[in-house]
Amino acid sequence: MRPRPCSILSLDVGRRRIGLAGCDALGISVTPLAALRRGRFDADLVVLQAHCCERSVQGLVVGLPLDAAGQPTAQAEHCQRYGLRLAAALDLPLAWVNEHSSTWAAGEQFGLKGDRSGRLDSAAAALLLEQWLAEGPELKPAQQTASRSGAGAGDGGS
């Protein structure tokens, strides 16, 4: 089921950078944004709050790197903690998207294989957002996704 269109900030959370992408309020145009070089959470939050205010963001989409069998990886657990903390700090609902192979796909699609500037991370975030706009699931308050997020991304229950 397609989610209700609204302005979204999509995050491809990595250990060094966070790829960012946004869409317009109608969910028509997805735009990769400048990637954020990771710092302390409070410093990241200042930058992400500014993006949210500037773009009138109404929700977050966070990629979860699941393995080929759809099971959470160690990095997925990190992304989950970060996404929940961010959604709570920004008071925004969120949805999870399975990002298995998204970085590889973005590298292939946009000719960015091996890029270390952050453009590849943001291209991956854009692909995640396009996937979410096409498939959902609906955004949910962070506290509702926290207890059910282990079920996997993109299954409607996370």
Swiss-Prot record:
Origin: domain of life: Bacteria
Cited SMART domains: YqgFc (SM00732)
SUPFAM superfamilies referenced in this protein's UniProt entry, alphabetically: Ribonuclease H-like
Record bears the keyword Signal: no
GO BP of this protein: rRNA 5'-end processing
InterPro entries registered for this protein in UniProt: RNaseH-like_sf (IPR012337), YqgF (IPR005227), YqgF/RNaseH-like_dom (IPR006641), YqgF/RNaseH-like_dom_sf (IPR037027)
Record EC number: 3.1.-.-
Gene Ontology terms: cellular component: cytosol
Enzyme class: hydrolase
GO molecular function list: nuclease activity
Disordered as annotated region, ranges: 138-158
Keywords, ordered alphabetically: Cytoplasm, Hydrolase, Nuclease, Ribosome biogenesis
Entry keyword DNA-binding: no
Transmembrane segments: none
Annotated function: Could be a nuclease involved in processing of the 5'-end of pre-16S rRNA.
HAMAP family: Nuclease_YqgF
Family classification: Belongs to the YqgF nuclease family.
UniProt name for this protein: Putative pre-16S rRNA nuclease
Organism: Synechococcus sp. (strain CC9605)
